[in-house]
Amino acid sequence: MSTLTFLLMDAPYEQARTSTAFRLIDSALRRKVGVRVFAYEGAVSLAMTGQKPHANAVHGRTLEEEAHPTPHAWVAALGAMAQENGVPFDWVNCGLCVDERGANEVVPCTRRGSPADFWKMNIESANTLVIPTR
């Protein structure tokens, strides 16, 4: 089975690069391709369960009307999709980055690791896509 590795660096809500990465990961999982993600720097916050949706007072929308997405829900949905499709999904948060940001409360389909995990993921994958910050 083919496996792809993604290295993400952007924090939630900062750049369109993150949502693009989620779309690529979603597409791979739908095609039953295994996915490994190494979250580095601000990207470790993508899986934080403390994120909450909010209303949009500027546009006069309630919480329900705004339907604000939370990245941790996307990460959990990707993990669930992989499980449903019977393909590997390994989301690793850089432990040093987690400690720097206090990003300890995360969705269950993720784990703590180190840059050595990214190295191993890279070697074992058909291809690796690094989505850097600017």
Summary of predicted features, one role per range:
Residues 21-30:
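Walker A/P-loop phosphate-binding motif and the immediately C-terminal alpha-helix
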Residues 29-30, 83-85, 122-123:
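Anion (oxyanion) recognition and catalysis
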Residues 55-93:
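A glycine-rich helix N-cap at a beta->alpha junction
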Residues 4-19, 35, 41, 46-47:
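Short, glycine-rich nucleotide/cofactor-binding loops
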Residues 53-57, 109-111:
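Short, hinge-like loop/turn segments at secondary-structure boundaries
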Residues 45-55:
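RNase H catalytic domain
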Residues 89-134:
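N-terminal glycine-rich phosphate/adenylate-binding segment common to multiple enzyme folds
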Residues 3, 30-36, 90:
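Residues at the starts of beta-strands that form the adenosine-phosphate
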